[in-house]
Structure formats: structure tokens, C-alpha cells
Curated annotation (Swiss-Prot):
GO cellular component, one term: extracellular space
InterPro entries documented for this protein: Beta_defensin_dom
Known function: Has bactericidal activity.
Signal peptide range: 1-22
GO BP, sorted A to Z: defense response to bacterium; innate immune response
The protein, known as: Beta-defensin 43
Organism: Rattus norvegicus
Family as reported in the entry's similarity comment: Belongs to the beta-defensin family.
Gene: Defb43
Length: 70
């Protein structure tokens, strides 16, 4: 009986932790490269929702152009 209760307790704890982690996560976009908008621009991608249900957008990293040597 104790084993069953401990297994149920662990399962309950594991189901609560992701909810608490998402609740405690930072809900704002703090950076010069992140902005809350209704739609991301072509050079941005969505990260998360902001507090007012806008989308937190982050600028994509640019890939360096490779020169062909031959």
C-alpha cells in the first residue's frame, strides 16, 4: 500500500512541476532582440506568448555566406 501511495505521489508531483515551471517563467520579452507583436516579421521567429496574448518574437541568427574558393 505504501508503494502504491508513493508511486501516486511521484506521478502527481511530476504532473504539477511543468505547470509550476511555466507559471513561474518570465512572461515578458526582455532584450533588444525580442519584441511583443501580433505577427513576427520575416527575419524573426516566435518564442512564447506575452502577457497581453501578443507573440514574443526573436530575431533569427544570420548565417555567414560561404565563399567558394575554387
Amino acid at each position: 500500500m505504501r508503494l502504491l501511495l508513493s508511486i501516486l505521489g511521484v506521478l502527481t508531483l511530476l504532473s504539477i512541476l511543468p505547470l509550476a515551471r511555466s507559471f513561474l517563467a518570465n512572461q515578458e520579452c526582455f532584450s533588444e532582440y525580442r519584441h511583443c507583436r501580433m505577427k513576427c516579421k520575416a527575419n524573426e521567429y516566435a518564442i512564447r506568448y506575452c502577457a497581453d496574448w501578443t507573440i514574443c518574437c526573436r530575431v533569427k541568427k544570420r548565417e555567414a555566406k560561404k565563399k567558394i574558393m575554387w
